[in-house]
Amino acid sequence: MTDRYSKYTKFEFDRPADRVLRITLNNPKTYNSLDAVGHREFTYIWRDIDDDPDISAVILTGKGKAFSSGGDFGMIESNMNDETARIRAWKEARDLVYNIINCNKPIVSAINGVAVGAGLVAALLADISIAGKAAKIVDGHTRLGVAAGDCAVINWPLLCGMAKAKYLLMLCEPVDGETAEKYGLVSLCVPDAELQDKALEVAKRLAAGAPSAIRWTKYALNNWYRMMGPAYDASTALEMLGFAGSEVREGLKSHLEKRKPVFDPNSPV
């Protein structure tokens, strides 16, 4: 792999076909969770991909049994206890979404197993999202005790409708690959054994297509997301505001203790 990607330490890279780059989240022992370094790399790698003249399509997947379990507990605790870390997380969360939206290369996600948090952001913002039947897609923000930020407010209602988006986001309801396809959250669902081959097939077709036409189509369609920028910015700010509150402390504690959270029913909101 070229020096362009040698600075990224949390991912594996390979080129399974001509002009196709595959990025594999590589921390299988923790279901490909992202620490502070991984989160930052995941945010800014899309700028290098955008500038890479040697690739025409990208595959994103996870190593082992999961796509990604999102930010690790260390990141959550830092966001709770350190204002500087919280502001940095807000900035990276913002940049991650816009960097994916603005990346000129078409992105194919191959969603294997659990997809949560920042990993789920990329999985569902991908231009073509392909889930294995055993995929488990869940936005766990409200279960943790913070508002659903990331990009859910701008893409879930577009993908599956406002009514279903509210149901899934407010209740942190998990969906498998087949259900995600039924709801419109993903482009396709395939048997798990066929997932990587299908993602590669799609990426090769994209790489062989008319590059300007495909990139302009992506750019135009993603204006739906750009128009929702103010809503996205508000949701992410509210998420970060929650990290300074009490609900997230109970959410994290209950998760570590493997029990249901018991939140104070009173709220000034």
Name each region found by the language model.
Residues 1-11, 253-269:
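Terminal low-complexity tails and localization/encapsulation signals of metabolic enzymes
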